[in-house]
Amino acid sequence: AVLGLEVARRADAALAAFAATRKPGDVLDAGLWRASRHPNHLGEQLFWVGFAGLALAHRGAWDPCCLGFLLNHVPDTLATLPLIDARMASDTKRVRNFLKYEAAVPLIYPTPASIARAFRGAKAD
């Protein structure tokens, strides 16, 4: 659960710093954002999985706290994140950069390839 909070905190801090200095056409493609298109949402998912794991370890059975993951994950994956991506792709100044980014980086859950990409850094692209 703590790991999830830290991932979300770092992703949100990077997003705030990017938003303060971005130019038209820019896409955030640094740090955690090189491994996941929505690492702040990944952090929330990790928080709920960790919370469910704590409940399992403490009580030996899944209980209603596990619903947090489902109630967060399902709307995120089916509605919120696709809408955010559609808005990004509809911005004429950044559509080319975003489509390239979208092709290279998974929606939420990092893959081995996206993790390797994150460690290589932007200069390797």
PLM regions and their residue ranges:
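Hydrophobic transmembrane alpha-helices
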Residues: 1-14, 19-125
